[in-house]
Amino acid sequence: MMARSLDANGAAKVYIIGRRHEKLDEVAASAVNKSIIPLQGDVSSKDSLGACAAKIAAETPFVNVVIANSGSTGPTLNGLPKDRTPSITEVYEYLWKPSMEEFNDAFTVNSSAMFYTLVAFLPLLDAGNKSPASPTISTGIKSQFIATASINGFSRKPGMGFAYTGSKAAAIHMIKTLATWMVPYDIRCNVVNPGIYPSDMSAVSIFAFHVLSIRWKDLFLRPVFSTGLNFH
């Protein structure tokens, strides 16, 4: 959705990075202005991120915005009883079952990968502020890094799970500190914290709340039913 919006609104080049090349190709093919360029890569790998940044740098002298939009749920709480308070034994056995690697995967994708995505593109973002060919010169809009976290990062309830909520809270605070730390470099850092929004990841949650009884477009595009967004 973000890539298509940038394409539709006149972005010269929109690079999208993901592990599934066929999905990237589908997005690129659907672009109105055909400015979306797919790159297969894994944002949880420094080597892969570095290779993607190097490829983009070889094709364009600068970028104006980098968006970190990947996400992972980690172990969820969906297997615990919903109609009663689970016993402490049930809680222990359920929470102890997933491996620490599964738990850490959410932090790798939602927090660490977000950070290294910014770092990988710092030289190109800096060039976006300085290149004579950059629209920054005429518009005055500085280079930007935007991350997607979650409204769950502010919640006292675990939501999709402790790994997910904790990793999103970490991402939110990291962007807050980066927003301050990047001031001398004129690189803006912001985080978007969506509520429940229709996507492959949220499909289970939407179904659980019986949202599917109403067409999602009717529900989410009407302000009275909107789950909202939070910006920082």
Predicted regions, residues:
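Short, flexible catalytic-loop segment of classical short-chain dehydrogenase/reductase
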Residues: N193-V204
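Canonical Rossmann dinucleotide-binding motif of NAD(H)/NADP(H)-dependent dehydrogenases/reductases
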Residues: M1-Y15
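A glycine-rich helix->loop->beta "capping" turn
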Residues: N33-I37, A54-A68, T73-G79, S99, ...
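C-terminal helical subdomain
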Residues: V191, A208-H232
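N-terminal Rossmann-fold cofactor-binding loop
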Residues: I17-E22, V43
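Catalytic loop of short-chain dehydrogenase/reductase
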Residues: S72, L77-F107, S112-F115, V119-P184, ...
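Rossmann-fold cofactor-recognition segment
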Residues: A31-D47
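A conserved hydrophobic alpha-helix of the Rossmann-fold in NAD(P)-dependent oxidoreductases
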Residues: L24, L49-A53, S202
